[in-house]
């Protein structure tokens, strides 16, 4: 599996969200690469890995990334957070975990009220079969909904998406299945490496309350929470400076 490597310094793995590719992290990459060696992952079926045979499944993807990277901090945005969290729960080489607009359980359950209804993802899966482009555009709009810079972020996401190979319907449906049915709350409770959880105050897809609930599950004393005021689901597009400062501070405190 191809992983782009850039920069110098302590290793940081970055994993993107649904339908996107690692190019979405450009605002962070620009500021982080003078200080960190960045491992920019395109998930299977996405971007430069659009033809990789690796299935879009947590164990297989995490194993493939781990085989190609040194001990590192792992950052996952949205869907990417599930892969980063699974890695942190299963691999000793994960020095720290950064969950960016990500949660161990993306859908509402009886004992997990601060999340979206599963119908959000099942409806997107159905709509993909009818109109691929319109469905992708609606999801990107949901990514930016609520942000104080929504229109600018939406234009950025559309431009970034089309800069590399776009995933096919089967790949996107596999990602939606992960979002709809994965529950890694037990992994958070048993988490060993320190973790930083970043929420967008105005995120409509992963409400800040769900990330706050996740941090309450994590071991005390090694868990940090940052809420980006005015941020939506992609706060690194609108608040890159604040994000970069938070990431560097967290990584600098790791043993």
Curated annotation (Swiss-Prot):
Q: Mention one GO biological process in which this protein takes part, according to its record.
A: biotin biosynthetic process
Q: What is its EC number?
A: 3.1.1.85
> What is the annotated localization of this protein?
Cytoplasm
Principal subcellular localisation of the protein? cytoplasm
Sequence positions that bind substrate? 18, 78-79, 139-143, 233
Record's keyword terms, sorted: Biotin biosynthesis, Cytoplasm, Hydrolase, Serine esterase
As one GO molecular function, the record gives: pimelyl-[acyl-carrier protein] methyl ester esterase activity
Can you say what this protein is called? Pimeloyl-[acyl-carrier protein] methyl ester esterase
Q: Which organism is it from?
A: Xylella fastidiosa (strain M12)
State which gene encodes it.
bioH
């Amino acid at each position: 599996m191809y992983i782009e490597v850039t920069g110098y310094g302590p290793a940081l793995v970055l994993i993107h969200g649904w339908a996107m590719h690692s190019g979405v992290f450009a605002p962070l990459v620009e500021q982080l690469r003078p200080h960190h060696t960045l491992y920019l992952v395109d998930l299977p079926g996405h971007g430069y890995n659009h033809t990789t045979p690796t299935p879009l499944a947590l164990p297989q993807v995490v194993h493939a990334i781990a085989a190609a990277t040194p001990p590192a901090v792992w950052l996952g945005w949205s869907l990417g957070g599930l892969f980063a969290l699974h890695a942190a729960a299963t691999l000793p080489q994960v020095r720290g975990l950064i969950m960016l607009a990500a949660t161990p359980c993306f859908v509402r359950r009886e004992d997990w009220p601060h999340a979206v209804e599963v119908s959000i993802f099942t409806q997107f899966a159905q709509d993909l079969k009818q109109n691929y482009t319109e469905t992708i555009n609606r999801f990107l709009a949901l990514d930016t909904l609520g942000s104080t810079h929504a229109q600018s972020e939406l234009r950025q996401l559309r431009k970034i998406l089309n800069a590399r190979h776009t995933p096919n319907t089967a790949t996107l449906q596999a990602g939606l299945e992960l979002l709809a049915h994965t529950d890694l709350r037990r992994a958070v409770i048993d988490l060993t490496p320190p973790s930083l959880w970043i929420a967008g105050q105005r995120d409509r897809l992963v409400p800040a309350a769900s990330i706050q609930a996740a941090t309450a599950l994590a071991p005390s004393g090694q868990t940090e929470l940052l809420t980006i005021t005015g941020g939506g689901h992609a706060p690194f597009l609108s608040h890159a400076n604040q994000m970069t400062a938070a990431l560097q501070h967290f990584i600098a405190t790791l043993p």
